[in-house]
A protein has these predicted regions:
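Residue-identity detector for glycine
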Residues: 9-10, 27, 51, 56, ...
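OB-fold ssDNA-binding interfaces and closely related basic DNA-contact patches used
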Residues: 4, 9-62
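Acidic, aromatic-enriched beta-alpha/helix-loop junctions
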Residues: 53-103
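Short non-domain terminal segments
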Residues: 28, 33, 38-40, 66, ...
Length: 134
């Protein structure tokens, strides 16, 4: 069995038990040379305010799945399908480089400042990202 840890109300940690057979039917995971003891997968959705693509990364270690980081950030502008600003302020730089090398994301050369951070716009390989889910 696997357990997903999440915060149902923003403060209270909850666990949900999921069978291994159910997880393996859904998708696959990837590993990085940086974090050899973790497996990763993606979560996708859309931001309600702009309709832009949201991508989150979850990690699995010792049968526990938990949120690792938000790959994307929602800035106040609508983007085309498969485009997203990458959260370079909170996501691990080495992980972002790995995702780029593996073809999950590709830089466009466009950036957008927001507060004290300049976010790069990336093209998302949504087909490939969609294969890697818990």
């Amino acid at each position: 069995m696997f357990y997903i840890t999440y915060k149902s109300d923003g403060t209270t940690a909850c666990k949900k038990q999921i069978s291994l057979s159910r997880l393996t039917e859904v998708g696959k995971t990837f590993k990085t040379p940086i974090y050899k003891n973790l497996e990763f997968a993606f979560t996708t959705s859309t931001y309600s305010t702009t309709g832009n693509t949201y991508v989150g990364i979850h990690s699995k270690k010792n049968d526990y799945i938990e949120p690792y980081c938000n790959l994307t950030v929602n800035l106040d502008m609508q983007l085309g399908k498969g485009l997203a600003f990458i959260d370079v302020n909170n996501a691990d730089r080495d992980l972002l480089l790995f995702l780029e090398e593996q073809g999950f994301i590709a830089p466009t050369g466009v950036t957008m400042p927001s507060e004290f951070v300049v976010y790069p716009l990336y093209r998302l390989n949504l087909n490939k990202i969609g294969e890697y889910k818990f």
